[in-house]
């Protein structure tokens, strides 16, 4: 079984595995340290009965069954069945409009929840830091964890209307 890593709301369900490299997948929205964080659970064999977008799930509640679904021709072998898990930030709340403008004629079957619109955070590093903090009886801060990541590039923003900064003021 696959369970929710943290309490949150089901944001998206793809139950048509042929439409994504992720196969069947679920995206959950969590509010952690006062900003939205998403978890993605992919290659699911099946989504638990009754799971719906907008539904609130508690930490540890079963949401699916691990599997090997994908849209690739060769598929995922039984021996390689696994859960593809991501912790993400949403890149652009207007992604669908951007996609239509910049990739005209191409399909976007998942709208806002297209994998290209999710910025991944390494879950292994995050869980390790969280464990270290707990061992030292310290509070873990997701915001601090993200702020401590190496800077890969700097972006000059020419508008005060930059949505990323509005959604994540503590990260800018």
Regions found by a protein language model. Name each.
Residues 52, 75-172:
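Acidic, glycine-rich catalytic/binding loops that coordinate metals and/or anionic ligands
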Residues 8-10, 51-66:
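A structural signal for short beta-strand/turn segments enriched in small hydrophobics and glycine
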Residues 16-17, 63-64, 69-71:
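Short, charged beta-turn/beta-strand-edge "cap" motif at the junction between a beta-strand
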Residues 38-48, 68-74, 104-110:
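Short helix/strand-bridging catalytic loops that position acidic/His residues to coordinate divalent metals
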Residues 29-31, 65, 88-90:
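Short glycine-rich beta-strand segments
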Residues 5-48, 76-82:
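Zn2+-dependent peptidoglycan hydrolase active-site motif and core
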Residues 18, 49, 71, 92:
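Conserved protein kinase catalytic core
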């Amino acid at each position: 079984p696959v369970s929710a890593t943290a309490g949150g709301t089901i944001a998206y369900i793809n139950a048509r595995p042929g439409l994504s490299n992720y196969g069947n997948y679920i995206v959950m929205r969590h509010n952690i340290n006062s900003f939205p964080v998403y978890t993605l659970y992919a290659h699911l064999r099946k989504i638990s009965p009754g799971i719906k977008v907008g539904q609130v799930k508690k930490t540890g509640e079963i949401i699916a069954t691990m599997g090997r679904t994908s849209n690739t021709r060769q598929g995922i072998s039984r021996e390689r069945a696994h859960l593809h898990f991501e912790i993400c930030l949403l890149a652009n709340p207007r992604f669908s409009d951007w996609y239509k403008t910049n990739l005209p004629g191409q399909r976007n079957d998942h709208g806002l929840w297209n994998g290209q619109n999710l910025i991944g955070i390494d879950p292994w590093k995050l869980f390790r830091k969280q464990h270290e903090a707990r061992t030292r009886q310290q509070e873990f801060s997701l915001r601090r964890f993200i702020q401590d990541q190496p800077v890969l590039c700097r972006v000059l923003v020419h508008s005060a209307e930059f949505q990323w900064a509005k959604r994540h003021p503590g990260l800018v």
